[in-house]
């Protein structure tokens, strides 16, 4: 993005320039890589090791690559996806429980300040928004932690009492008995996965319920007069959600992200709303730097810094 700021979104179709998993590496490079990673284990931060580690352990990339095993019949990728997806699910369930316990006597940051007369669509998996607004006012666009899917029948099954769920116990007592990869024929195997829609550009339909949810989300945006989008990057993998906003250009839309006024974010907004970067005017919104064009305001702020009630009133 620093070298080609104007063309970055067109040139970049993934988060990495190199796919290190598929490279043929020389012995010299392998030696340097090992030494670099060892340095990264020292107490002092090592930037190269951190970058390499982040790339090789990118959970989104791993989920995308391994989920495709269900479509190209690769048992090894399917097994890897089961492991990665349930590990991610277990981590999120444990962290969710930890956060809720830590804020048992106080409101959650950001979520605790969401006005209760709103309807909200979230692309996060955690239950924080539903805890604040209730299930009837919340749509989990990419699924959530409280359901899982049997892949051969597309049955969407609930996780009992997700807020108090012991993830290790659930995997041991529910997931393991429902997974069978012993047969060589994939059609004879049985897989259950968390109901988390992987970050593919072409979104898989894990269950018919998601068709209904995405239609309902579009209807909510259609009915709204003012839409506030918080902490969402509008990346290409979520083009199906971007298109919902694109199809309703007459709505007042506030977009709150720290990089809202940056060059690369403006280029992204041009793709979504069709408004050239030079059409935006600099303004202030509740004390924050912002840009405005037509009915769209780009507000440079973090989620916890904004007051949603004031934005709706302003």
Please provide the spans of the model-predicted regions:
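Short, charged, surface-exposed secondary-structure boundary motifs
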Residues: 146-157, 263-268
């Amino acid at each position: 993005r620093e070298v080609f700021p104007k063309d970055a979104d067109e040139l970049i179709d993934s988060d990495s320039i190199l796919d290190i998993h598929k490279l043929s590496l020389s012995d010299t490079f392998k030696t340097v890589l090992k030494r670099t990673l060892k340095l990264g284990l020292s107490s002092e931060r090592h930037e190269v090791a951190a970058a390499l580690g982040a790339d090789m352990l990118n959970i989104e990339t791993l989920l995308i690559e391994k989920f495709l095993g269900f479509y190209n019949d690769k048992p090894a990728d399917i097994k890897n996806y089961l492991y990665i997806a349930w590990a991610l699910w277990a981590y999120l369930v444990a962290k969710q429980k930890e956060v809720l316990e830590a804020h048992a006597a106080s409101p959650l940051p950001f979520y605790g300040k969401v006005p209760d007369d709103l309807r909200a669509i979230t692309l996060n998996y955690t239950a924080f928004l539903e805890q604040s607004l209730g299930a009837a006012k919340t749509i989990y666009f990419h699924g959530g932690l409280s359901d899982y899917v049997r892949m051969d029948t597309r049955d969407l099954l609930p996780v009992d009492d997700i807020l108090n769920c012991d993830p290790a116990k659930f995997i041991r007592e529910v997931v393991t008995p429902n997974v069978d990869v012993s047969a060589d024929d994939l059609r004879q195997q049985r897989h259950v996965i968390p109901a988390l829609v992987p970050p593919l550009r072409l979104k898989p339909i894990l269950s018919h319920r998601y068709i209904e949810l995405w239609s309902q989300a579009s209807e909510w945006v259609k009915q709204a007069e003012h839409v506030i989008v918080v902490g969402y990057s509008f990346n290409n993998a979520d083009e199906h959600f971007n298109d919902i906003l694109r199809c309703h250009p007459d709505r007042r839309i506030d977009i709150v992200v720290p990089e809202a006024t940056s060059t690369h974010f403006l280029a992204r907004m041009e793709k979504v709303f069709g408004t050239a970067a030079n059409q935006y005017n600099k303004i202030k919104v509740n004390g924050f730097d912002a840009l405005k064009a037509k009915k769209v305001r780009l507000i440079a702020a973090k989620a916890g810094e904004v007051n949603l009630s004031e934005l709706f009133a302003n």
